[in-house]
Amino acid sequence: MFTTGLPEGVRSVEAGKFTGLGRGARQIVAPRVLVDATSVPADRGALGRYVDGLVAALDAAGADLAVACQRADEERYGKLVPDARIVAGPTAIAHRPARLAWEQTGLPLVAQQVDADVLHSPHYSMPLRAGVPVVVTVHDLTFFTEPDAHNPVAATFFKSAIRTAARRATRMLVPSKATRDELVRVLDADSTRIDVAYHGVDHELFHRPAQEQVRAVSDRLGLHGQLYLAYLGTLEPRKNVPALITGWAAAVCDLPDPPALVLGGGSGWSEEVDEAVAAVPAHLRLVRPGYLRFRDLPGFLGGAQVVAFPSRGEGFGLPVLEAMACGAPVLTTHRTSLPEVGGDAVAYTEPDSESITEALAQLLADRGHREALGAAGHARAEEFSWAASADAHMACYQRAVGQRGE
C-alpha cells in the first residue's frame, strides 16, 4: 500500500495491472474500468451482493479493474479482487450527504488518477462531470411506478438521479428486460443506450444446505426444529411484507402445527409492517431476526417449507434466485422482472393478502409440489452466474468507450 496523488483523505492500493502510465502512453485493448462501490451499505444487502459478485467475476476474468470503496471496505475488496486497484475514499463518505458530494468532486479525480477509460456507477446516481464515459446501473423504476412504497425523501432523490442518468449517462445497465421497458415507457429513454445484464448468484454460498446447517440456523433463530416460512429482504411496503404477514396468518391459523414466519432483513421506513405484526394471532409465531449472516442464508432459505417473496415490483429479484439456488420452493408474484427470474420454476400469486393466503395454503398442503418446485428452481438457478453477468457488463463498458465524444 502506498499514498498517491489522490484527493485528500483518499488512499490507494496498487495492483500489477496498473502501470502508472498516462492515457497517451498505452493502447486500450480492453477498457480500464473504475467501479464506484462507495454506495454499498455496511449490511451489504442486495446492492452489496450485486457489486461484490460483479467485481469478483470481473477480476477473475482478467478485467483491468479499479474499485473505489468506503474506507471500512478497503480490506474486504483487497481480498475479494486481488488483481484490482483499490481506492478508499475519505472517512466522511460513510455518511450519505458527504458521499454524494464526493461523488461529484472526488470520484472524477479518482477516475483521472487511475487512468480509467470508463466509470461504472452501480446505484442510480453519477458524477455530472466525470471526464470519462459513465455507465449507470438503474435497478428499477418503482420510485416512479410505486411512489407510495418508498420514503418520500428517497423517492424524490432517486427519481431525480434516474432522470439524470437517462439524460447524461453514456450508457445504462439494467438487471432485467422489465426494467429496460419501464425506463423507455416512463422516461422515454433511448433503448439503444440500455443494456440488460442479469444478476448472478454465488453458487459457493447459495447451495442446497446440509441438514446440520438447517438445524444450526433453526436453533439460532430460536425455532429448534419448528417448521417455518421464510422471507428475505428489507421489511418495507414495496416488498409487500404486510400482505405477506396477513396472508400467512390466515393460511396457517387453523393448522394443528402452524409453521412460523421468519422475516429476515432490516426494517424499512414504514410502520405498516409493525401494524401487521401486531394483528397476528397470539398462538402464531413470527420471528424478526434482522439481518442474517451470509453464511446462515443457505440454511435459512433451504430449510424453509416455502420462501415467500410477494413483491409489488422488482428490478430483478435476487432473493428469489438465491432461494432457488438453495433448493427452496419459492412463491412470488408476476410483477415486473420476477417472471424473468423464476420462469416456470416457482409458484406465483397476486400481491393481495387473500391471494397469498390461497397460494400458501395450497403449497403447504402439497409436499410433492413443494419438492418439485425446489428441484426445478435449483436447476433454473444454475442458468445464472456472475461470470455471465460480468461478460454482459464488459460488453456495455466497451460500447461506452466506443461512444466517447458522441
Task: Mark where each language-model region is.
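Carbohydrate transferase catalytic cores enriched for Leloir-type hexosyltransferases
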Residues: 1-406
